[in-house]
Amino acid sequence: MRALLRWLRSGRGRVHSLLLTVLVATGMAVAIPGCTTNPVTGRSQLMLVSENQAIDASRSAYVEMLAPARKEGRVDADPAMARRVQGITEKLVAQAVRYRPETADWEWEIVVIEAPDTVNAFAMAGGKMAIYSGIVEQLELSDAELAQIIGHEIAHALSAHTAEKMSVALASNLALTGFALTGDRSELALTGAALGAVLGVQLPHSRAMESEADEVGIELAARAGYNPDAAASLWRKMAGQDNGRPPAFLSTHPAPASRQRELTRLADRFRPLYEEARSATVPTHPVAGGDAD
């Protein structure tokens, strides 16, 4: 906590502190704490910020986050990779909509950000996603392994994890620590567009959230016709990065040995769905790509 507060007070964290303040200034934080049930897993979630509020914030944040890469021509710079990612995503989103029919109205979108040294991907509330080219190229992903990554990110969105993380941040009084509601409110309104990026992407998921996303993501991929065994092979590749040290973003995932066992168990559980999907016509759902406004 102290380290986070030092970062918030630093120049790099100034905008982020303003964003946290926006939650209070604009009434996104309610006075009475509330809990709800995870729409996918049934787990009880703290929800001071509603899913719709998180979706609204993420929509603006997504545009802001992609703006530098778009300006530099790094969004969907490789048309073949972009088409590959979008095609897989459309199959996965069709299965996501089966989980939660109301998500058919989400503005689903995925882009590939050209960044050869970045092994990462993210999803925001409302189905706004990005995958970095480095994770595809460095790990030499098969379609099934790529489907596991995208399915995992979709699962975070389906499970309202962005809103949950925003709520946990509020409950920890981050928005009230040392920052007064002073200055031009129009500035707060402008920086509020990036709120979803800060709390929806930069704050890490809890291990409970990661475990949920593993399970739901593997099931989505299996239903879409992608071999669930790819989850374990993907994990082995990721864990072998950087001379045996997994990427930093895996730090909140379960321990390697236990996660490997769990992924294998889940693969066995969902294999019948995969076998069924292989002999059927797999549906798709429209997903916007990098050329979308």
Regions found by a protein language model. Name each.
Residues R2-D293:
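A Zn2+-metalloprotease active-site environment signal
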